[in-house]
Amino acid sequence: MIPLQKDNQEEGVCPICQESLKEAVSTNCGHLFCRVCLTQHVEKASASGVFCCPLCRKPCSEEVLGTGYICPNHQKRVCRFCEESRLLLCVECLVSPEHMSHHELTIENALSHYKERLNRRSRKLRKDIAELQRLKAQQEKKLQALQQWLGQLEHMPAEAARILDISRAVTQLSSLVIDLERTAKELDTNTLKNAGDLLNRSAPQKLEVIYPQLEKGVSELLLQPPQKL
């Protein structure tokens, strides 16, 4: 194992991963680490029952990771994420009747799993936005053509309304993409529940209300279920 560099603290570098600090967390002794790096260290140290600073080896409290890492019911470190209840669980929670039949993931697997789902959903919505932009351009061309034919002025309000519907859909989907990408980038145990809620809110069947007035072919394309998003 590569020895931890004590002088890296002044450079804003995590002594564990040797990279720039991400979501810096300070131990009781004042040393800074990436939150993910320190969390993994705590999980490995939990087997011995003693958590020490990885740099100076002084005893530390697991509470340095924040309240999101401590079970509010049993005051013990959380170790699993329940997908059904979307709650962080400690060892005592795992044996409680309400969670016995639930599916739980380790914290590390949950973070990886939800980050991948958020990124996939974001990529899917970006494709939807591109398709909507293409449709918007088509509708604008139709409107321009109609404007050249005064005899067809009665059709202009409907075309203009369709463009407005598409513009609104693009705006709302763009906002969802921003939320998905930000949540994936900042995902930690404090935001796992929000990640599940966001995936539910951006599910294809939920998005139907965003563009109910679009042409049938495009609506079917956008609302088709992605592969396990």
UniProtKB/Swiss-Prot annotation:
It is an enzyme of class 2 (transferase). Zn(2+) binds at residues 71, 74, 93, 99. A zinc finger (RING-type) spans 14-57. It catalyses: S-ubiquitinyl-[E2 ubiquitin-conjugating enzyme]-L-cysteine + [acceptor protein]-L-lysine = [E2 ubiquitin-conjugating enzyme]-L-cysteine + N(6)-ubiquitinyl-[acceptor protein]-L-lysine. It comes from the Eukaryota. Its EC number is 2.3.2.27. Residues 107-154 form a coiled coil. A zinc finger (B box-type) spans 66-107. It holds the Pfam family zf-C3HC4. InterPro entries: TRIM/RBCC, Znf_B-box, Znf_C3HC4_RING-type, Znf_RING, Znf_RING/FYVE/PHD, Znf_RING_CS. Belongs to the TRIM/RBCC family. This is E3 ubiquitin ligase TRIM40.
